[in-house]
């Protein structure tokens, strides 16, 4: 059969091109109907998993809250690190990735290495959407995103030897209105 004849047959809708599918006609309608009556016979193994949720930790209750895999419900951990060199900083990043809070005491390090260490861990903390807080002199707290950090310290009161005044006298106000004298000397009066 030539190509032109086949095209004519397709356009005209001749049935002789459908002869390849005639072997399906050998099945009787009764066999198809019998198969449709029992659909469980043809279901896959995935249907048995449709009723179970592997992430459900509620124990069969009707709660809409599901657990996240990989996150333990154990108590939170805090790692206190006193590194002596920058080479120990990847341990702090790994602890943050494991959702542990890290407190770095950098008093044992040189100041330039300590600055580098803080920058490195702060970058890692930022990458995981964590929080950082300066706790004291060369002591820093880094927490993952699952930990909320709040600062409950209030501003320290002024020492007793420092007095603050809120009212200004008229002399002080009048002095502040005049222009200050230049630091290089008194201005010379210009001749008119």
UniProtKB/Swiss-Prot annotation:
This is Cell division protein SepF. Pfam families: SepF. The keyword Cell cycle applies. Residues 162-178 have a biased composition (Low complexity). GO terms for biological process: division septum assembly; FtsZ-dependent cytokinesis. Keywords: Cell cycle, Cell division, Cytoplasm, Septation. One of its GO terms (cellular component) is cytoplasm. Homodimer. Interacts with FtsZ. Cell division protein that is part of the divisome complex and is recruited early to the Z-ring. Probably stimulates Z-ring formation, perhaps through the cross-linking of FtsZ protofilaments. Its function overlaps with FtsA. Transmembrane segments: none annotated. Residues 154-192 are annotated as: Disordered. Belongs to the SepF family. It is found in: Cytoplasm. Coiled coil: none annotated. The keyword Cell cycle applies.
């Amino acid at each position: 059969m030539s190509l032109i004849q086949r095209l004519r047959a397709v356009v005209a809708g001749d049935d002789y091109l459908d002869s390849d599918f005639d072997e399906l006609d050998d099945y009787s309608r009764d066999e198809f109907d019998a198969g449709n009556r029992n659909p469980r016979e043809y279901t896959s193994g995935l249907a048995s998993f449709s009723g179970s949720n592997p992430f459900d930790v509620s124990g069969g209750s009707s709660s809409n809250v599901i657990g996240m895999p990989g996150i333990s419900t154990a108590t939170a951990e805090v790692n206190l690190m006193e590194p002596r060199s920058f080479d120990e900083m990847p341990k702090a990043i790994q602890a943050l990735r494991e959702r542990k809070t890290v407190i770095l005491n950098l008093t044992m390090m040189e100041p330039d290495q300590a600055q580098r260490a803080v920058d490195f861990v702060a970058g890692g903390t930022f990458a995981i959407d964590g929080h950082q807080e300066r706790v004291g002199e060369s002591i820093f707290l880094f927490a993952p995103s699952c930990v909320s950090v709040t600062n409950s310290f209030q501003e320290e009161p002024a020492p007793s030897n420092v007095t603050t005044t809120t009212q200004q006298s008229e002399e002080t106000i009048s002095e502040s209105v005049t222009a200050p004298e230049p630091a290089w000397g008194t201005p010379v009066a210009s001749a008119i």
